[in-house]
Structure formats: structure tokens, C-alpha cells
């Protein structure tokens, strides 16, 4: 296995003078698993409990010392300490319709969500009172551990489960974290793709997952190449009716390789791109290819990516009980997985069962597609924007029309 050794630097969307390092959080299977897939290196946000005004009176000498310290920190560590009240990403929950579903009493109860990532730091205050199932393919620990260089798994779990500051999308789901990626000696998060495949099967066979959330991915194999292990595992579980939500990838722009990440390229997977708080597609969100292969085109509702969700400057739980801001399709993936959990709570007949064959996935994906269009208007798909922006409440309404599947 060749490890990814190059780190790219990208300007922050709202502040081009601040440069962030790309988050190296996905395995390097045969040079195809990209660190870019999971997003940028988060910028740490230090909370202050009480601040009456966003400015302070200090002497000139102290001001110069503070300014000098900040410049050194930004240059050395590529993160910026923000001495303001702890911000949130409430817009992401409100604009996506998630808070509307939560107002109906939905919180994910009874739905099994399995996340494959770097592990989790369950000591963060965002998870107070939470119990989870933990499977460790990295170190064999029986207790929850975070192996990520920047606590990537903790960040993703916080979006879904947070119990404080910013309530997660589906905070009461039955949750499992499967650790398959870890920080290496170079400070990067890497892993073996075969472990990702094993984790996907564990989510199915041991945890009985309804939803598998994958904020990771790699490059789609070229025509004629053997199907990868993670793609095979993903295809197997989706054909059994288990929902898989995966990141589209973060290589959008002039260097885009022309398709979403793998295993997000599997037809029945819900593949997610990112948009900002104004509903604009994030420039680094990966585009999809209209073709499955040289002889077959993708069909509705499986065009890639399927949907955009909030993914720019999202606040979530991080290492050392701090809160971080991150951007990328990793974040967006969790918003869609959590929204789906709320829908499955309300309509449990759509959950996988022993005789499921994937038809309910097809129906739910059709509902997702229709939730972005007006009545009697044919769906329109864009290779970067998908069918449109996530509206969890409309998705719920469309899902309510599904009969037996």
C-alpha cells in the first residue's frame, strides 16, 4: 500500500488570506484513495463563556504582543484562534429542514447508524450521556478510541450525535463507530482499503445497520479494472436494502478526475456534495460522470452526485474537548445520513429486513430526487449540483407517499 505524502493547501472560502491544509483522512489503496475526500484541516475555535462585546481595551504593547503571537500561530500551525463566543452552524440545520423534522419529535430513535472513520473521542462534552457500539480494526481496543490526526471521526460523529451547544441531526440513533483509519508517523491519516470493506460488512452482519455513513472514499477504477473491495462490499449491502451514504469527494475544480469518489460511485449509494450557507455549490465538491462505464449510462435516481448538503465551515466536536470548523463533503454526508435516520424513524417499513432486495432504497432515492423539484416537473440533474439542495422536510413528505417496496 502506497501512502499519500503530499498535502495541498487551499484558501478558506470566506477568507482567501487564510490557507488551510487538506485533511489527510482516507486510506491510500493503490494510490487511489485520496486524502482530499474528507475535507480541509479544521480550524480550531476556542470558546469563551461570556463576552459582552466583540472587542477589548488593551495597551499598545499588549496589542502588539497579541498580534505577533497570532501571526506565529497561524504561520506555524495553519489554524487561527478565534477569541469570540463559540460559533455554531445552526444555519445548516435550519436551512436543510432538519430542525423542522426535529420539531415533529423525530430524533433517530430506533434507527441503527454505523459510521466508518478514524474512531471517536467519547469524552467530549458533546457526547455526554451517550453510549455507543465501537469496533476497532486499528488497535483492537474494546473501548472507544480516536486514532485520527485531527479527530476526523469525532467531528463527523458530533454533527450527528451532539447533545449540547448545537444539537446533532439525529442525536438518539443507535450508533456504532468502526475505526479503520489512523494517524501515521508522518501525521497523516491512512488505512487499508480491505479494512474499510471489512468494516462495511461488520456494520451489516454484526451491528445490523440501517444506514452506513462513509465520509471517505477513493478514485473510481478505470474501465476494465477489477472492482475494489470496498465497492464490492458496498454493492452487497445496498442490494440487501441497507442504505449507504457516502462523500462525493473534494477534488472539484480544474483538477477534478471526472467522477465522484468510490464507493460513492455505486448506483444505490446516496452520494453527497457540499454547498455553503447561501445554497451555492462548494467549488471543491467533486463532479459526477453520467456514465457507469463505456457501455452503460447512469439513470435516475442514481445520477451522481444525488444531492448537496451543508458542508462549508461546519462547527462540530473535535479533539481535546474543543469545537472545530471544517469544510468538505465529509460533513455534508453526515447531514444526509442523519436526515435519512429521521425519515426511517417515522417510516420504519422502509428499513432493511431479512427479505429486503434494495427496492426500498430505490424508492427513497426517488423521493429524494423528487424533493428537489416542483410538482409535474421532470427532474433535472447537474454533474456538480446533483438534483439540488437537501430539504429534509420535503424528502420526508415525498417518502410518506411510498407504499410497499
Regions found by a protein language model. Name each.
Residues 43-61, 81-114, 138-149, 285, ...:
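N-terminal domain-start motif of subtilase-like serine proteases
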Residues 117, 261-345:
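Extracellular S/T/G-rich loop segment that most often corresponds to the catalytic His/Ser-adjacent loop
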Residues 59-76:
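Hydrophobic membrane-insertion alpha-helices, especially the h-region
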Residues 2-15, 47-55, 144-222, 273-276, ...:
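Subtilisin-like peptidase catalytic core
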Residues 178-182, 311-381:
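Hydrolase catalytic cores
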Residues 102-113, 120-133, 144-192, 239, ...:
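Subtilisin-like serine protease catalytic core
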Residues 2-8, 182-268, 302, 319-333, ...:
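Substrate-binding/access-modulating region of protease and related hydrolase catalytic domains
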Residues 1-35:
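N-terminal targeting leaders characterized by basic, low-complexity, disordered sequences
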Amino acid at each position: 500500500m502506497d501512502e499519500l505524502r503530499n498535502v495541498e493547501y487551499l484558501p478558506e472560502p470566506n477568507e482567501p488570506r487564510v490557507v488551510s491544509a487538506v485533511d489527510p483522512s482516507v486510506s491510500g489503496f493503490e494510490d487511489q484513495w485520496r486524502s482530499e475526500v474528507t475535507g480541509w484541516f479544521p480550524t480550531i475555535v476556542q470558546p469563551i463563556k461570556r463576552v459582552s462585546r466583540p472587542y477589548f481595551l488593551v495597551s499598545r504593547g499588549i496589542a502588539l504582543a497579541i498580534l505577533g503571537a497570532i501571526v506565529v500561530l497561524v504561520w506555524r500551525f495553519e489554524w487561527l484562534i478565534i477569541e469570540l463566543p463559540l460559533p455554531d452552524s445552526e444555519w445548516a440545520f435550519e436551512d436543510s429542514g432538519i430542525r423542522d423534522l426535529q420539531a415533529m419529535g423525530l430524533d433517530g430513535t430506533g434507527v441503527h447508524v454505523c459510521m466508518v472513520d478514524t474512531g471517536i473521542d467519547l469524552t467530549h462534552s458533546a457526547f455526554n450521556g451517550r453510549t455507543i457500539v465501537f469496533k476497532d480494526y486499528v488497535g483492537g481496543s474494546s473501548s472507544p478510541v480516536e486514532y485520527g490526526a485531527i479527530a476526523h471521526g469525532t467531528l463527523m460523529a458530533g454533527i450527528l450525535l451532539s447533545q449540547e451547544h448545537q444539537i446533532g441531526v439525529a442525536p438518539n440513533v443507535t450508533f456504532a463507530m468502526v475505526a479503520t483509519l489512523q494517524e501515521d508517523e508522518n501525521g497523516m491519516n491512512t488505512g487499508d482499503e480491505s479494512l474499510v470493506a471489512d468494516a462495511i460488512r461488520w456494520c451489516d452482519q454484526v451491528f445490523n445497520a440501517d444506514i452506513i455513513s462513509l465520509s471517505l472514499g477513493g478514485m473510481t477504477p478505470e474501465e476494465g479494472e477489477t472492482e475494489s473491495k470496498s465497492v464490492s462490499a458496498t454493492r452487497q449491502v445496498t442490494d440487501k436494502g441497507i442504505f449507504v451514504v457516502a462523500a462525493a469527494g473534494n477534488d472539484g475544480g480544474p483538477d477534478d478526475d471526472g467522477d465522484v469518489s468510490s464507493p460513492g460511485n455505486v448506483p444505490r449509494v446516496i452520494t453527497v456534495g457540499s454547498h455553503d450557507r447561501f445554497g451555492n455549490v462548494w467549488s471543491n465538491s467533486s463532479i459526477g460522470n453520467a456514465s457507469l462505464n463505456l457501455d452503460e449510462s447512469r439513470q435516475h435516481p442514481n445520477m451522481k452526485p444525488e444531492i448537496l448538503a451543508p458542508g462549508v465551515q461546519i462547527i462540530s466536536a473535535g479533539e481535546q474537548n474543543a469545537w472545530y470548523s471544517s469544510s468538505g463533503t465529509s460533513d455534508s454526508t453526515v447531514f444526509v445520513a442523519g436526515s435519512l435516520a429521521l425519515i426511517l424513524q417515522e417510516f420504519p417499513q422502509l428499513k432493511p429486513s431479512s427479505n429486503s432486495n434494495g427496492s426500498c432504497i430505490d424508492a427513497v432515492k426517488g423521493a429524494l430526487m423528487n424533493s428537489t423539484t416542483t410538482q409535474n416537473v421532470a427532474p433535472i440533474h447537474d454533474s456538480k449540483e446533483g438534483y439540488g439542495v437537501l430539504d429534509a422536510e420535503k424528502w420526508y413528505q415525498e417518502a410518506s407517499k411510498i407504499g410497499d417496496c
